[in-house]
């Protein structure tokens, strides 16, 4: 059985609370899009958990959580979020958390752009109240094919990935210098950042598109519940 929860407003509809209630009876909980610009608070096991990227299904034992293809993922935020809930006794391993190799990475410059543009707009009273998490800019670059996907972290030593990273950085430096008079970012620093994130998250990165199919096949004799 597949259960879908979606919002019809601009957030704050209570999706997180509904998902937390439904997750108790789910086998797999999938977050298919979005980033860490908003979050939800869940009270479980007499503790408060504030989640921005992880589905609240992560708080339930035997529930597998998936961050899907449509996500834009702030890698540092995700690593910190995992560490924070582990400190409260929640088990997070590659067995119960799967990251789509096709999900988009929120690059360091996305938050920089968001901050600079919001500051520029504020001077004329036109600021729109961005969370400054870089979500819109990550999605924009996704559709412009000017960012990396999580799966690229597994191939950082390949020349094709490094060349793409260099081209992306060159274009972004021109954009930031021309629009906001920013100093250029260096390629070695950017590559080191990518390598550090890969070292933390590589065990979780899989082909989640194929995963539900194989999971269903393995449990063909049961009724799987997907949320």
Kindly give the residue locations of the regions a language model identified.
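Conserved small/polar residues in nucleotide/adenosyl-binding loops
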Residues: 216-223
């Amino acid at each position: 059985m597949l259960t879908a929860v979606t919002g019809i407003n601009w957030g704050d509809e209570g999706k997180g609370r509904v998902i937390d209630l439904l997750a108790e009876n789910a086998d797999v909980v999938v977050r298919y899009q979005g980033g860490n610009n908003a979050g939800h608070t869940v009270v479980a096991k007499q503790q408060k958990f504030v989640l921005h990227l992880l589905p609240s299904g992560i708080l339930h034992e035997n529930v597998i959580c998936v961050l899907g293809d449509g996500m834009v993922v702030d890698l540092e935020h995700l690593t910190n979020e995992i560490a924070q809930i582990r400190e409260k006794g929640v088990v997070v391993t590659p067995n119960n958390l799967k990251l789509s190799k096709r999900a988009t990475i929120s690059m360091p410059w996305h938050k920089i752009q968001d901050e600079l543009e919001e500051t520029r707009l504020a001077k004329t009273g036109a600021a729109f109240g961005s969370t400054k998490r870089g979500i819109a800019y990550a999605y924009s670059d996704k559709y412009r094919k000017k960012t990396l996907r999580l799966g690229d972290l597994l191939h950082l030593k390949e020349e094709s990935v490094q060349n793409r990273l260099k081209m992306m950085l060159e274009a972004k430096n021109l954009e930031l210098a021309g629009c906001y008079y920013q100093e250029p970012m260096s390629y070695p620093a950017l590559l080191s950042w990518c390598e550090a994130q890969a070292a933390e998250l590589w065990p979780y990165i899989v082909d989640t598109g194929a995963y539900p199919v194989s999971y269903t096949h393995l449990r063909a004799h049961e009724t799987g519940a997907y949320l």
